[in-house]
Amino acid sequence: MDQNLALSPDFPSRLPKVGTTVFTIMSALAAEHQAINLGQGFPDFPCDRKLISAVHAAMLAEHNQYPPMVGITELRQGVSQKISTLYGHEYDSDTEITITAGGTQGIMTAILCCVSPGDEVVIIEPAYDSYRPSIDLAGGKTVAVSLTANRDDQGMVSSYSIPWDDLTKAINTKTRLVIINTPHNPTGMVWQKSDLERLANLVRNTNALILSDEVYEHMVFDGHQHISIASHPELAERSFLISSFGKTYHVTGWKIGYVAAPVAMMKEFRKVHQFNVFTVNTPMQYGLAEYLKNPDHYLGLPAFYQAKRDYFRQGLQQTKFQLLPAPASYFQCVNYTKLDIPQAKLSEADFCSWLTTEIGVAAIPVSAFYAQPVESGVIRFCFAKEEKTLSNALERLQTL
């Protein structure tokens, strides 16, 4: 094959603007410099051995061939029961729930099944980096609005809020899909009941559908509850709900999640899903179905991660980083612009590179979650780590 073919008009790129992600770059840099990786969002502690045993038992029971395209009955029923118990919405496990190869596949498949060339899709930045490429592959047009960056008396970003005026202007007759993410990555911001009601008012007389990315649903802190799109009956009737077993049960490498949606929407979703991945790992589905029977495994997560958040925040308070609120998810954003070092004037990407190579702690620039980087001096740490890992990272960060 001609090596120049990939660069020629005969083989045009479907995603010409997409390069290597910042997550890959920072993880590689962390490995090269033996830095503590608090950049990419994955745990460094093991999952529950009971879950491993459940998957092992499924393998020994010969659950090793193709499962149903939509996922095994037992797991879909477990998901339906969980959503009903937590959020009060009844999804039919036969027609309204599909097991996916992770949340990202669920997101892409949902977009591909409903977005046609020329359709507009509204996203709220900073945003998970899979949204735009999926929209591009569907031929849609991304319409991005930015979270409002609230600033303190010194002009530093101190929190984020939903940009309702911009969101109102962005939704029109061409809008096919609105993507929301709660709890939010990277900021940890959460949508409230009043926010969902306001969103319902915006889309009520439109043909816009909703994609609600809720992969951090079990990581909401300080006694608050996750407000799912499923808890709002009107919005649930036009929404894809996306979640992730990998995030919930500390098994991100398994790449398994689920999507729930009304029957008409799920029918179209499954048409794409069957040719996108066809189906998902069989023994892991059986293991998760068994593990899901005990709700304590996810009901205990808020306290589990809040303890890690509090430990990490307490350590960061011994530095000159300004801590932003972290009400949910397993991320902590900080502002570095008041550090008493020359590097405090660097761009977010350059600061993260310096932090990794010179201090030995990897982080992610929040600017990377925008198509056009917005510099606000804010970076993201992941605290889904062993206490020893966090302690070692804090020891290094406290030298700043």
Regions found by a protein language model. Give the residues of each.
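PLP-dependent class I/II
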Residues: 1-12, 16-19, 28-33, 40-58, ...
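Glycine-rich loop-to-alpha-helix module at the N-terminal edge of alpha/beta enzyme cores
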Residues: 38, 62-65, 78-85
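Short, surface-exposed loop/turn segments at secondary-structure junctions
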Residues: 66-67, 299
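Short beta-strand to alpha-helix junction loop
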Residues: 70-71
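Conserved AMP-binding/adenylate-forming core of the ANL superfamily
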Residues: 75-79, 102
